[in-house]
Amino acid sequence: MDELPNRERAPRNRTITLSGEERERYSGKLLTLTHSMAPGELRNRTIHGDLLAILDFLPRRFVDLLFIDPPYNITKDFGAATFRRTTEEGYGNWFSSWFPRLLAVLKPTASVYICCDWRSAGVVQSIAEKHLIIQNRITWEREKGRGAKSNW
């Protein structure tokens, strides 16, 4: 796993970080998928990998709760990969390219939480509601982050 840069954090930042020793101890417990596995082999395990690369290895209809936090529609480096900001239509096309494939792993009674930025929330919801029943949207005020003061 890549090391995060050691930088000064804002006084109210509560980001959890691991020491080198903790990273070594916990990374040994991560599961890297290279082939299909039965639900019992995955239960109570933490899978480490690129979702799009391992999606076809996941069993069908075994997920009770899906929490996804895809890249927001901003240009950002993620270690070796970079996500580039695009148009709303482009972001929707990208989201649609993988999101429906993910639904096969859900149990019929599963709950899904999707994180997104306020600019992309509309397109994400319009795609999600083609496949799911939307119960609620959760929005919270962030006191940190880009433009937080001017957003509220």
Can you annotate each of these PLM segments?
Residues 1-152:
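Core catalytic lobe of class I
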